[in-house]
Structure formats: structure tokens, C-alpha cells
């Protein structure tokens, strides 16, 4: 089993209008992490940048301009993917996992398309696997205990000690998501969570 754990930071909520500014994650094969990556990247020409996104990511327009060019990041990222699958074999693809993963899937696909690369589907199985939905299913008996379903809130509910200053960094968020998945898996989908667990570090 080949899994791509991935999280993106973006300049807004619309993959058509807005851009990608960080791509981070890990590839695991048969439950063993074989590669990790963390790319900071400049928005593509024409990508809109919202003030809210800048505030969330604690970054300025000038700092974004100093980041690596999208083309070079795209080439490095494709090299990583090609190291672990054969894009010419329709049965050899990566399962994409994340928290609210359809958001990241849509942005990543559009990011490639904006750079005239249309073979995204050669690498990734559709649909992506959303850890948020697994948590929602498992926690339905204790749903009223969750004040919201943001990653940080849910992680705390599962007893994960947060480094709140690192939330909205793609590398930290996907690390958090992987730990959350481990805890969901230990309980089993028919398990339940009705109250917050004592926090423990990642």
C-alpha cells in the first residue's frame, strides 16, 4: 500500500483564483515512511492573495516573492513521486490522505494544471481519503463535545498535545493528521470518543 500524506497552505479558498504557497507531507509504503518533503513556494502569476490567508500563514507579500519558483518546486515534487510509482502503470498510484483532503486535492490538481501539467491522475487515486470524515464517523456519539471540527480542536479532543504556534504550517499539520489517524485507527471505526483525553505529545 502506497500512501501520500499531504497538506497545503494556500492564498485563499478557491483553487481557480488562489494559489499554493506550501506543500508538505510524507510517503509511506506498507506503513513505513520512505520519504518526507516540505516545499515553500511562490504563488503563480495571476494567483490572488487574500489578507486572511497572509494573516493565517503569518507571511507577507514580500516574503512570498522570495520563495522558490513554482516550476522548480513542481519538478522536485514530481521527482519524489516518480521515485515511488510508475506513472505509466495505471495500477501503481498513491492513495492521498489528509485532513479535509478534498480541499488539498483540488488545489494541488489545479496548481499542476496552471503549469500546463495534466497528468496528476497518473500519480494519485481518486477520491482522496479524508481523516476528518473518519473522525466524524467515529465520534458521532460524542459529537456535542467538539466545539468545532478544526484540525487543532479535534487533535486535542483525541489527547494530542498541540504546538499552537505551528498550526497552519503544512508540515506540522500533516504530522498532526498522521498522529490523529493513528489514534483513530487504535480505537477502530466502531470505537467512540465522548470526551477529551489527557494530552500527550506527538
Question: How would you name each of these model-derived features?
Answer:
Residues 3-7:
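Short, hydrophobic/glycine-enriched beta-strand segments
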Residues 8-16:
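Short acidic, Gly/Ser-rich segments with clustered Asp/Glu that frequently serve as metal-coordination loops
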Residues 57-84:
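Metal-dependent phosphoesterase signature
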Residues 2, 17-21, 27-59, 81, ...:
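Metal-dependent phosphoesterase core characteristic of DEDDh/y 3'-5' exonuclease domains
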Amino acid at each position: 500500500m502506497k500512501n501520500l500524506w499531504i497538506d497545503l497552505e494556500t492564498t485563499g479558498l478557491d483553487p481557480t483564483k488562489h494559489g499554493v504557497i506550501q506543500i508538505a507531507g510524507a510517503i509511506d509504503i506498507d506503513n513505513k515512511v520512505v520519504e518526507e518533503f516540505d516545499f515553500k513556494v511562490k504563488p503563480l502569476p495571476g494567483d490572488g492573495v487574500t489578507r486572511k490567508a497572509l494573516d493565517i500563514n503569518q507571511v507577507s507579500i514580500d516574503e512570498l516573492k522570495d520563495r522558490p519558483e513554482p516550476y522548480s518546486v513542481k519538478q522536485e515534487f514530481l521527482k519524489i513521486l516518480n521515485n515511488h510509482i510508475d506513472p505509466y502503470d495505471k495500477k501503481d498510484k498513491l492513495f492521498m490522505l489528509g485532513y479535509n483532503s478534498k480541499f488539498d486535492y483540488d488545489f494541488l490538481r489545479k496548481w499542476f494544471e496552471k503549469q500546463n501539467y495534466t497528468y496528476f491522475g497518473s500519480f494519485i487515486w481518486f477520491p482522496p481519503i479524508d481523516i476528518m470524515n473518519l473522525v466524524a464517523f467515529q465520534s458521532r456519539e460524542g459529537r456535542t463535545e467538539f466545539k468545532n471540527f478544526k484540525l487543532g480542536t479535534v487533535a486535542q479532543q483525541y489527547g494530542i498535545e498541540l504546538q499552537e504556534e505551528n498550526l497552519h504550517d503544512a508540515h506540522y499539520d500533516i504530522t498532526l493528521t498522521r498522529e490523529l489517524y493513528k489514534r483513530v485507527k487504535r480505537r477502530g471505526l466502531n470505537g467512540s470518543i465522548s470526551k477529551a483525553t489527557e494530552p500527550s505529545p506527538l
